[in-house]
Each structure stands twice: as structure tokens, then as C-alpha cells.
A protein has these predicted regions:
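Short, small-residue-biased leader/transition segments that mark boundaries at the very start
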Residues: 1-7, 198-205
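Intrinsically disordered, low-complexity linker/terminal regions across diverse proteins
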Residues: 9-197
Length: 205
């Protein structure tokens, strides 16, 4: 794949090591947490432990492409309509099937990163593992300040007000005790942007 030509295995290994390092710090933070009950804390630790890391580019093409075909004589509109119908048919067949956690939701060349609560995974395509975000020539401190901040940000989505609704398998399932969920909601309100105002205008930010 094209992305494979843009990122060395050493860079993939280096950023993967950074992910493991930051995940370890998340575990330390959870261990030292003072407001979560042991039951919820244990489930949060399990969610971290089962989080999958996708780095650089997918090892195989998305299986959807095995089901797409057009005729050489098709005009553009006909080809688009055929591909659209084939894509819809593919997704309908996925209903009720086990989730393929190895499937990527973004291409390897994309300059972005993501956390998927439905799979409990974080994805770092080759596109974002390039300057000005990352370089093997930079110091560890520089890479932690750039890519490391992005890694920490994406992991945090697993415990934000949306990610917290899903368990370690990506199921929409409440894994919080009522008291812990109430405490979490109160802490979320404390950092809500709705409480911030621009002093010059008195408008909410």
C-alpha cells in the first residue's frame, strides 16, 4: 500500500512504544484515583488493557473491496450507482455478524487519529506520523509533545461522556456504579465549556 512507503517499521514500533508508555500512565492514574469505587476502577482498567492499537496502515485491504466491481463500458453515473448498491448490500450482510476489530475505519494516508468506542481501539494512520507531528529524527520530548499529546487525547475519549457509555468490547453497556456515574457527571459539569464566558462580551464560549 502507498502508506507503507511513507512510514518505516521503526517509526511504527517507536510510536507503538509511546502508546504503551502513555497507557501505562493511564493505569497509574486509575490506580491512584480517589473517587471511583473498586468495581468501576477494575472495569476501567480492563477497558485500557483490551484497547487495540492500529498503527500506520492496515495489514490487509478492507474486505468490502472484494465485493465491488464495475464494467469497463459503464459510464460514470452507472459505475457510481453500481458501487453504491454493492456497498449497501455488503453492509446489510454485516448486520448480526461479529465485529471485525481488525478493520480500519480510516485510510492509512489520512492526517488524523481517532478512538472508536464501538471497537475500543485507537488508530494512528501513517499520514499523521510525519512532520510536523512526528519524526524519528526528533527527540523523545519533541515527539511526546506532538504525537504523545494526540495519543493521550485519543485514549481519553474512551472515558469521556460518550466513550464512558461503552464497555471494553464496544458494547453500549453501563459499567459504572450509580454513585460513580453521578460523581463522573458532576466532574464533567465542572469543566463544561458552558460555564466559560468571554469577559469582553459576556457571551458563552
Amino acid at each position: 500500500m502507498g502508506s507503507e512507503m511513507c512510514i518505516r517499521d521503526s517509526a511504527k514500533a517507536d510510536v507503538t512504544a509511546m502508546v504503551k508508555q502513555i497507557l501505562a500512565q493511564y493505569r497509574v492514574q486509575l490506580e491512584n484515583n480517589t473517587w471511583l469505587s473498586p468495581a468501576t476502577k477494575q472495569k476501567a482498567m480492563r477497558k485500557l488493557a483490551t484497547m487495540q492499537v492500529k498503527m500506520g496502515y492496515p495489514e490487509r485491504l478492507f474486505s468490502l473491496y472484494d465485493h465491488l466491481s464495475v464494467d469497463a463500458d459503464d459510464d460514470l453515473l452507472t459505475a457510481i450507482l453500481k458501487l453504491s448498491a454493492q456497498t449497501q448490500a455488503f453492509w446489510f450482510k454485516q448486520v448480526g455478524q461479529p465485529v471485525d476489530r481488525n478493520q480500519w475505519n480510516m485510510p492509512g494516508h489520512l492526517v488524523n487519529a481517532s478512538y472508536d468506542p464501538l471497537k475500543n481501539d485507537i488508530t494512528f494512520p501513517a499520514g499523521i506520523l510525519q512532520p510536523p507531528y512526528y519524526s524519528l529524527k526528533w527527540t523523545r520530548a519533541e515527539n511526546l509533545g506532538g504525537t504523545g499529546a494526540t495519543i493521550g487525547h485519543e485514549i481519553s475519549h474512551s472515558f469521556d461522556n460518550n466513550g464512558a457509555l461503552y464497555d471494553e468490547y464496544g458494547n453500549l453497556h453501563n459499567w459504572w456504579t450509580p454513585a460513580d456515574k453521578q460523581a463522573f457527571d458532576q466532574l464533567v459539569k465542572a469543566v463544561s465549556y458552558t460555564h466559560l464566558r468571554a469577559h469582553e462580551t459576556s457571551l458563552h464560549l
